[in-house]
């Protein structure tokens, strides 16, 4: 087993700290609102909590998708070591986002979630994205990679429809100003477009190499 360098350990520690900073700040502001009724979370604290946690889930999802293109562009294979961590943070924030909706918005009437899923399309796609994230989080360990073998890669290709569903969830949720969801949709389009281009280029290269040599005219 390869040893993890000190620089990677330090970098991972910094990434953990940065990834936990948004939820730590949100927790502190929620505590202020709970204790003193301050306006630390604005006029609608529940909406603010749901918005922030959902936004960070989407951001971490896109950052996770950006790891492979960044590795290919920079040649820094060490970036792959951060992909699992970032993907798990996407699932973490998505789960907090869902929990906030269930406990603060529905106020514990969780059976209403099924009615909401059927009635509101943005909740339908958002809940579907969270459900698809779950098997990715569960199978993210080395043990599951060994068990699933080639199927592991197939399972984790779910991240592509998850990205589409997450952006669509945000887009449909916004009622008027779509600039922010459009920005994230553009980033997702670039990340998926890069993968499609690389795959097409690889196929063309393979086809050229396997093509029989043409006879030289006399």
UniProtKB/Swiss-Prot annotation:
<comment type="function">
    <text>Part of the MsrPQ system that repairs oxidized periplasmic proteins containing methionine sulfoxide residues (Met-O), using respiratory chain electrons. Thus protects these proteins from oxidative-stress damage caused by reactive species of oxygen and chlorine generated by the host defense mechanisms. MsrPQ is essential for the maintenance of envelope integrity under bleach stress, rescuing a wide series of structurally unrelated periplasmic proteins from methionine oxidation.</text>
</comment>
<keyword id="KW-0472">Membrane</keyword>
<keyword id="KW-0813">Transport</keyword>
<feature type="transmembrane region" description="Helical">
    <location>
        <begin position="86"/>
        <end position="106"/>
    </location>
</feature>
<keyword id="KW-0349">Heme</keyword>
<protein>
    <recommendedName>
        <fullName>Protein-methionine-sulfoxide reductase heme-binding subunit MsrQ</fullName>
    </recommendedName>
</protein>
<keyword id="KW-0249">Electron transport</keyword>
<keyword id="KW-1003">Cell membrane</keyword>
<dbReference type="GO" id="GO:0020037">
    <property type="term" value="F:heme binding"/>
</dbReference>
<dbReference type="InterPro" id="IPR013130">
    <property type="entry name" value="Fe3_Rdtase_TM_dom"/>
</dbReference>
<dbReference type="GO" id="GO:0016679">
    <property type="term" value="F:oxidoreductase activity, acting on diphenols and related substances as donors"/>
</dbReference>
<feature type="transmembrane region" description="Helical">
    <location>
        <begin position="121"/>
        <end position="141"/>
    </location>
</feature>
<keyword id="KW-0285">Flavoprotein</keyword>
<dbReference type="GO" id="GO:0005886">
    <property type="term" value="C:plasma membrane"/>
</dbReference>
<keyword id="KW-1133">Transmembrane helix</keyword>
<feature type="transmembrane region" description="Helical">
    <location>
        <begin position="155"/>
        <end position="175"/>
    </location>
</feature>
<dbReference type="GO" id="GO:0009055">
    <property type="term" value="F:electron transfer activity"/>
</dbReference>
<comment type="subunit">
    <text>Heterodimer of a catalytic subunit (MsrP) and a heme-binding subunit (MsrQ).</text>
</comment>
<dbReference type="GO" id="GO:0046872">
    <property type="term" value="F:metal ion binding"/>
</dbReference>
<keyword id="KW-0997">Cell inner membrane</keyword>
<feature type="transmembrane region" description="Helical">
    <location>
        <begin position="8"/>
        <end position="28"/>
    </location>
</feature>
<keyword id="KW-0408">Iron</keyword>
<comment type="similarity">
    <text>Belongs to the MsrQ family.</text>
</comment>
<dbReference type="GO" id="GO:0030091">
    <property type="term" value="P:protein repair"/>
</dbReference>
<feature type="transmembrane region" description="Helical">
    <location>
        <begin position="60"/>
        <end position="80"/>
    </location>
</feature>
<keyword id="KW-0288">FMN</keyword>
<keyword id="KW-0479">Metal-binding</keyword>
<keyword id="KW-0812">Transmembrane</keyword>
<dbReference type="InterPro" id="IPR022837">
    <property type="entry name" value="MsrQ-like"/>
</dbReference>
<dbReference type="GO" id="GO:0010181">
    <property type="term" value="F:FMN binding"/>
</dbReference>
<dbReference type="Pfam" id="PF01794">
    <property type="entry name" value="Ferric_reduct"/>
</dbReference>
């Amino acid at each position: 087993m390869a040893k993890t360098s000190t620089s990677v350990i330090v970098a991972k520690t910094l990434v953990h700290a940065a990834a936990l900073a948004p939820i730590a700040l949100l927790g502190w502001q929620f505590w202020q609102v709970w204790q003193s009724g301050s306006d630390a979370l604005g006029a609608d604290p529940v909406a603010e909590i749901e918005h922030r946690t959902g936004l960070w889930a989407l951001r971490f999802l896109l950052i996770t998708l950006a790891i492979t293109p960044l590795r290919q562009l920079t040649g820094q294979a060490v970036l792959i070591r951060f992909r699992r961590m970032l993907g798990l943070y996407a699932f973490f924030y998505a789960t907090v986002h869902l929990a906030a909706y269930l406990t603060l918005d529905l106020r514990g009437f969780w059976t209403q979630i099924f009615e909401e899923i059927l009635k509101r399309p943005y909740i339908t796609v958002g809940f579907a994205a969270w459900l698809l994230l779950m098997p990715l989080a569960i199978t993210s360990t080395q043990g599951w990679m060994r068990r699933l073998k080639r199927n592991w890669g197939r399972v984790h290709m779910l991240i592509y429809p998850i990205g589409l569903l997450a952006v669509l969830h945000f887009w449909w949720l916004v009622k008027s100003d779509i600039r922010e969801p459009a920005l994230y949709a553009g980033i997702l389009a670039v990340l998926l477009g890069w993968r499609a281009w690389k795959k097409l280029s690889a196929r063309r290269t393979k086809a050229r190499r396997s093509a029989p040599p043409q006879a030289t005219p006399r």
